[in-house]
Amino acid sequence: MTLNLCVLTPNRILWDSEVKEIILPTNSGQIGVLPNHASIVTTIDIGVLRIRHFNDQWFTIALMGGFTRIRNNEITILATAAEKGSDIDPQEAQQTLQIAEDSLRKAEDKRQRIEAKLAIKRASTRVKAINPIS
């Protein structure tokens, strides 16, 4: 039994193939999805989508929020933005994280702190997506 996974962004189809399992970051925590999972519609948090392929190799996608629908072994993820871990430049991702952390230290009001924390969450998600599960 397999799962059909489709990850869509406003600009493109990022992933469209059969997989064994996924670990999905939702607003209420991570959920693991295997074949014959209960049908749900849920929001996606900023976080790393982990995908287990048939050869037991793991792949990652940095998700920047969105929605997902799981029904009849079909998983459709509508992401605000997404990037494959293998496409992320490690040096650039680390630099972006450092800039976001500096922005938090320099934040002068509540709005700047909230924006900086969100930037840190996005940047750290990209850094985490670089290294898939072994």
Curated annotation (Swiss-Prot):
Molecular functions (GO terms): ATP binding; proton-transporting ATP synthase activity, rotational mechanism
GO CC terms: chloroplast thylakoid membrane; proton-transporting ATP synthase complex
Keywords from the UniProt entry: ATP synthesis, CF(1), Chloroplast, Hydrogen ion transport, Ion transport, Membrane, Plastid, Thylakoid, Transport
Membrane topology designation: Peripheral membrane protein
Major subcellular location class: plastid
UniProt entry tagged with the keyword Transport: yes
Xref: InterPro entries: ATP_synth_F1_dsu/esu, ATP_synth_F1_dsu/esu_N, ATP_synth_F1_esu_C, ATPsynth_dsu/esu_N
Database matches in SUPFAM superfamilies: Epsilon subunit of F1F0-ATP synthase N-terminal domain (SSF51344)
Cell location: Plastid, Chloroplast thylakoid membrane
UniProt subunit comment: F-type ATPases have 2 components, CF(1) - the catalytic core - and CF(0) - the membrane proton channel. CF(1) has five subunits: alpha(3), beta(3), gamma(1), delta(1), epsilon(1). CF(0) has three main subunits: a, b and c.
HAMAP family the UniProt entry points to: ATP_synth_epsil_bac
Protein purpose: Produces ATP from ADP in the presence of a proton gradient across the membrane.
PANTHER family found in the cross-reference section: ATP SYNTHASE DELTA/EPSILON CHAIN (PTHR13822), ATP SYNTHASE EPSILON CHAIN, CHLOROPLASTIC (PTHR13822:SF10)
NCBIfam families in alphabetical order: ATP_synt_epsi
Family (UniProt): Belongs to the ATPase epsilon chain family.
Protein name stated in the entry: ATP synthase epsilon chain, chloroplastic
Organism: Pelargonium hortorum (Common geranium)
Organism classification: Eukaryota, Viridiplantae, Streptophyta, Embryophyta, Tracheophyta
